[in-house]
């Protein structure tokens, strides 16, 4: 989910779901996933933070994220720092979203890339899944979710407050269900899971402990406690978009 921005098309498709943002019930990632980065706002938020969406380096010049994280042709900045502070190194590039984004409720095409002006050096890109490889996953399959989103949701008199700190976080969830475009991942703390929240949108959900990005974070429940809804990268439509920018497995 992008910073508390709810895409109307997603809301219609998923009813009560709201876009995802930050990792909850997780821990600081440190250097475990250096290929996961955050989109940095040109202006600071009122809480002193900067990052509004997450994503993954999938080639030296291509950064994978969600379409609802930007506008076609927009110039954006990306950090790969595990704990971002103003003035840290960023990489500049151009945002390109799937042109079919938002036109189909069953497959919203909520996928995008940032093409960097210069290749990112010293970071090994993540891998993508092969075609159709996620259709028959075991119910016990785990996913590693990574992102810069909200790390805690508090219930205040004025409503829920989402707390951010621009730190790359990681959590593990378990497969809940599979449909043609989505995976639903349990992030219920009572069963030992963690997951995503606002600000984690576009970030990766790695298959188990591998370097394969199975799906990207798109949405979930509004208080970031039960379900992480992620967009599959093994589908024909996702691969059709990605094939314009990277060589697919």
Regions found by a protein language model. Name each.
Residues 23-32, 43, 71, 76-135, ...:
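Conserved catalytic-core segment of clan PA serine endopeptidases
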Residues 42-45, 68-72, 82-85, 116-122, ...:
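Acidic glycine-/aspartate-rich tracts in secreted/extracellular proteins
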Residues 1-22:
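Secretory targeting and sorting signals
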Residues 31-38, 181-184:
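Short, hydrophobic/aromatic-rich segments at coil-to-beta transitions
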Residues 46, 76-85, 101, 139, ...:
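Conserved active-site regions of diverse hydrolases
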Residues 23, 29-35, 51-71, 77-78, ...:
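C-terminal subregion of chymotrypsin/trypsin-like serine protease catalytic domains
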Residues 108-193, 228, 235-243:
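Chymotrypsin/trypsin-fold serine protease catalytic domain
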């Amino acid at each position: 989910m992008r910073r508390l921005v709810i895409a109307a098309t997603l809301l219609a498709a998923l009813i009560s779901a709201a876009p995802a943002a930050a990792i909850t019930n997780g821990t600081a990632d440190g250097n475990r996933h250096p290929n996961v980065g955050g989109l940095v706002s040109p202006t600071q938020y009122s809480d002193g933070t900067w990052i509004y969406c997450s994503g993954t380096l999938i080639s030296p010049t291509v950064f994978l994220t969600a379409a609802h994280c930007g506008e076609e042709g927009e110039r954006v900045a990306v950090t790969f720092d595990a704990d971002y502070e103003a003035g840290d190194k960023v990489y500049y590039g151009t945002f390109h979203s799937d042109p079919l984004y938002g036109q189909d409720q069953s497959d919203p095409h909520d996928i995008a890339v940032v093409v960097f002006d210069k290749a990112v050096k010293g970071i090994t890109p993540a891998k993508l899944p092969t075609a159709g490889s996620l259709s028959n996953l075991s119910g016990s399959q785990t996913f590693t979710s990574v992102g810069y989103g909200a790390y805690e949701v508090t219930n205040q008199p004025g409503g829920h407050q989402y707390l951010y700190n621009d730190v790359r976080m990681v959590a593990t969830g378990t497969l809940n269900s599979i449909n043609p475009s989505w995976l639903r991942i349990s992030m219920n703390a009572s069963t030992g899971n963690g997951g995503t929240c606002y600000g984690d949108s576009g970030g990766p959900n790695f298959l188990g402990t591998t370097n394969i990005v199975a799906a990207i974070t798109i949405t979930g429940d509004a208080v970031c406690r039960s379900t992480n809804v992620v967009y599959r990268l093994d589908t024909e439509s996702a691969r059709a978009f990605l094939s314009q920018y990277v060589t697919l497995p």
